[in-house]
Amino acid sequence: MNLTQIWKATLSALQTQTSRHDYEALLRPATLLSLDNGAAFIGVSSPGQKEGLENRLLMPLRNALARVVGYPVQVQVLIANLNSRTEPSPSLTLSNGSRLMSDPEPVVAETPAPALTPGNGTGERVVQLDLASAMRSGMLNPRYTFSSFIVGSSNRLAHAACLAVADNPGQAYNPLFLYGGVGLGKTHLLHAIGNRVLDRDPEINVLYVSSEKFTNDLINAIRRQQTEEFRMRYRNIDVLLIDDIQFIAGKDATQEEFFHTFNTLHSAAKHIVISSDRPPKAILTLEERLRSRFEWGLIVDVQPPDLETRTAILRAKAEQMSVHVPDEVIDFLAHKIQSNIRELEGSLNRVAAYAELNRAPITIETATAALADLLGNQRRRRISAEAILQIVSEHYGIEVEQLRARNRSRHVVVPRQVAMYLLREETESSLVDIGNLLGGRDHTTVMYGCEKIAEEINSDSRLRSEVMAIRERIQMLRG
């Protein structure tokens, strides 16, 4: 494996062990400069990133690297200058006389080999790298497009709304507010909007930014007495894509500035798309005037992917990686990893890296070994299909036998379809198994019931609450 492959496998392992914030802000922008005689040098772009890695993630990083390469590793974090372009060099010498060896195999274009420059006056040597990372600079990531987004019942409404905004910015759904748990594709959709807008009209001014970067830019502008420049930057754009807005809650100065930025853009028919991990009304300490503005347009819930969507995501990821993953392994991962897309893709990365390092075929046994720590944390007592039927029937106040009967009245049909959906999601039962369990129904009837519930929980808040309540009881029973 070359440096790029080692670092990719390391990030895949860390992706499921760290918070989204630490992964995106500290790990993802970093790069593996060299690995020689058990010494790994990690390049970062700022003192803050260096401090964050060293204080919070050094041990997990060291352990993940060691697992990938198969031997103990010492990690040193170096400040990198990401703004200047340098020609690749075969090696470089640090101030202590040790050498950083460049990758002996070809490296992707955005990570050419490093070269040293004189000190920056802080006593630190600076490694200059051309790492054209869109996420790092607040620009758009070209990999996040609508064509690379897997659409399923859990995100179909969000996808359609984002596509409508991208095709007609400044028109309907302004603002568009996306909310949902970590790793469900909200950031992907924000970037997809920006990329499509620019594909259609390169002259449109689009800005993607996290709420944390907005806050940091404001703080720096105040400190440098450049608030007018800050306002010029944020209020002279056509499409503002702001991620994780919940982090401005409780920050009075940031909320004040964003309030006026929002008003300026909205009154000029500029489009604003916002993401959050919760709906506006659930963001505590968010000013009421901002909350009301977020509710002016369309609010869309992004749900965790269902089994079929998880399977499609894994197949697309395997194709993107140019790795053959047998169907039974895809099914195994789709059933085991249910929380979010990021963990799902990260798990496939880990399995592929584990198989490559051990020169082993990708099998269920290989996947189980590669994900031993993750699956160990998720290990739960199995719950029987009969127990799920009992929980569903108790929730709706009917008998289990009514779920199996041919009764087609609505007060039984909906609970029966909910039972089909939960049996498909929470157990490894096939459609045929579920049909047999529910009075010998055809597998196509079961498929229809599952799809109907998966579709309706996106638009029917009452049904969504009922399914969530039943799922909570299932989790409690599992322990």
From Swiss-Prot:
Compartments where found: Cytoplasm
Similarity-based family: Belongs to the DnaA family.
Lineage: Bacteria, Bacillati, Chloroflexota, Chloroflexia, Chloroflexales
Ranges of compositional bias, category Polar residues: 86-99
SMART domains, A to Z: AAA, Bac_DnaA_C
Keyword Endoplasmic reticulum listed: no
Keywords: ATP-binding, Cytoplasm, DNA replication, DNA-binding, Lipid-binding, Nucleotide-binding
Region of interest: Domain II: 71-138
Name of the protein in its database record: Chromosomal replication initiator protein DnaA
Organism: Chloroflexus aurantiacus (strain ATCC 29366 / DSM 635 / J-10-fl)
Gene Ontology terms, MF aspect: ATP binding; ATP hydrolysis activity; DNA replication origin binding; lipid binding
One Pfam family linked to the record: Bac_DnaA
A biological process term (GO) from this entry: DNA replication initiation
Annotated binding of ATP, by residue: 183, 185-187
Region (Domain IV, binds dsDNA), start-end ranges: 356-479
Highest taxon listed in the record's lineage: Bacteria
Positions of the UniProt region annotated as Domain III, AAA+ region: 139-355
Function as written in the Swiss-Prot or TrEMBL entry: Plays an essential role in the initiation and regulation of chromosomal replication. ATP-DnaA binds to the origin of replication (oriC) to initiate formation of the DNA replication initiation complex once per cell cycle. Binds the DnaA box (a 9 base pair repeat at the origin) and separates the double-stranded (ds)DNA. Forms a right-handed helical filament on oriC DNA; dsDNA binds to the exterior of the filament while single-stranded (ss)DNA is stabiized in the filament's interior.
Gene expressing this chain: dnaA
Sequence segments annotated as region (Domain I, interacts with DnaA modulators): 1-71
GO cellular component: cytoplasm; plasma membrane
Subunit annotation: Oligomerizes as a right-handed, spiral filament on DNA at oriC.
Residue ranges, annotated region (Disordered): 86-106
